[in-house]
Regions:
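Sec-dependent N-terminal signal peptides
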Residues: 4-16
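Rhodanese-like catalytic fold shared by cysteine-dependent sulfurtransferases
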Residues: 17-38, 46-79, 88-127
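Phosphate-rich cofactor/ligand-interacting catalytic cores and adjacent structured alpha/beta frameworks
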Residues: 42
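Short, surface-exposed ligand- or partner-binding patches at beta-edge/loop junctions that are enriched
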Residues: 83
């Protein structure tokens, strides 16, 4: 029952996300120009991640983050880019992280779909 309430709260509060919004072009430019590390958090499933992901992105599925938010505490003081395939799962994770006091979160407009459409190359894991 607790998970249902948390899920409903996240769904109804997605409109209040205050994360900074970058385009995929901005992300690509900032990855290549920034001197400090961005935490690139890919919240898709492991199978989606293996089929193609941004170089140096870490994969923690949105389900893992929602069920065990303590996994994210190591990144609390980092600038973090959160993304998924289309933005729905990333939005849920961003909302949760903001409720936990994370302040420097970036959302990607269009997420992985926009990156693919723009022709950005993805790294693929060979299994």
């Amino acid at each position: 029952m607790k998970k249902i309430y948390i899920s409903l709260a996240l769904i109804f509060s997605l409109n209040s996300i205050s994360a900074e919004l970058w385009t995929v072009s901005e992300l690509n430019e900032r990855i290549s120009k920034l001197k400090h590390d961005l935490v690139l958090l890919d919240v898709r499933t492991q199978a989606e991640y293996a089929s193609g992901h941004i170089l140096n992105a870490i994969n923690i599925s949105h389900e893992q983050v929602l069920e065990s938010p303590e996994l994210m505490t190591v990144y609390k003081d980092s600038q973090m880019v959160v993304f998924c395939r289309s933005g729905v799962r990333a939005g849920k994770v961003i909302q949760l992280l903001e409720s936990l006091g994370f302040e420097d979160i970036i959302d990607i407009d269009g997420d992985m779909l926009a990156g693919s459409e723009a022709g950005y190359r993805m790294e693929v894991n060979d299994e």
